[in-house]
């Protein structure tokens, strides 16, 4: 809670005193502040003391996701935990930047967690920063509830990285199919093979998933030959012309061939997504 007082007003900039400290606010943001005036206002400042975002914390679980607005232009160095109670349900907005900013990543990690009434709320985890609404990372599969998918479609997020850490759901696969322009999809190794297995009959794998599944599994299961073999047999159901995919595929094949000591007499060829083993 801060004591905010308008000192002088201008066409583009207002001089404002907040807890006896002077800040210069964009006139548009000041109008937004007046519009949202109340006890539950979030003021976000950059490291030069300039207000970059004004947001109301009077948001509701997922039916009207005003919370997402909070992260759009968040540049503050020292944002603390904000807790708001709505209808006796505690909804947490956890944003801890401080020393955890990783500029080269350029996004927050957002996940969905259950709240007391069984509904869902967005939760922002530390470790990342956000530059704009077009670069958001969703973690976990609960995020793919129907309303979340609708919301993401509505705000038109062009660049989205998808990190799946739990189970596969129909909504997850539907979401992936709707967003085939994903820059990349990062898959938890524990579910990579499950996705491949599921995709055999559903025919929903995209090139991005194939690449990251193969790369992740090959790298992390490099000494688990049975898993590598299962992976290679799974991806034969997928056709791709991606050089990155076949590079990973080739690494896995090479390790398997070495493992069975048939490198000199056993050649493995692949073309158009089909593996040909030739003795």
Residue locations for each model-derived region?
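Feature for intrinsically disordered/low-complexity regulatory segments and propeptides
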Residues: 1-70, 89
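Intrinsic disorder/low-complexity polar-acidic segments
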Residues: 65-279
């Amino acid at each position: 809670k801060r004591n905010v007082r308008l000192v002088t007003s201008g066409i583009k900039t207002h001089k404002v005193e907040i807890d006896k400290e002077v800040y210069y606010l964009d006139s548009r943001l000041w109008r937004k502040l007046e519009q949202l005036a109340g006890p539950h206002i979030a003021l976000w400042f950059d490291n030069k003391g300039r207000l970059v975002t004004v947001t109301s914390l009077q948001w509701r679980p997922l039916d009207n996701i005003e919370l997402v607005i909070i992260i759009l232009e968040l540049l503050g160095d020292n944002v603390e935990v904000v807790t708001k109670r709505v209808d006796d349900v505690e909804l947490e907005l956890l944003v801890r930047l401080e020393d955890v900013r990783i500029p080269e990543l350029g996004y927050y990690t957002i996940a969905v967690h259950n709240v007391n009434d069984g509904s869902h709320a967005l939760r922002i985890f530390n470790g990342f920063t956000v530059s704009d609404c077009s670069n958001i990372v969703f973690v976990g599969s609960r995020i793919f509830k129907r309303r979340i998918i609708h919301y993401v479609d509505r705000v038109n997020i062009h660049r989205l990285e998808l990190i799946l850490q739990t189970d596969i759901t129909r909504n997850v696969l539907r979401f992936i199919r709707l967003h085939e322009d994903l820059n990349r999809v990062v898959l938890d190794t524990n579910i990579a093979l499950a996705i491949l297995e599921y995709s055999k009959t559903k025919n929903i794998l995209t090139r991005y998933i194939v690449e990251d599944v193969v790369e992740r599994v090959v790298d992390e299961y490099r000494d688990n030959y049975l898993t590598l073999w299962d992976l290679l047999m799974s991806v034969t159901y997928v056709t791709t012309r991606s050089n990155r995919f076949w590079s990973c595929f080739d690494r896995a094949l090479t390790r398997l061939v070495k493992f069975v000591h048939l490198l000199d007499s056993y050649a493995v060829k692949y073309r158009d997504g089909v593996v040909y083993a030739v003795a």
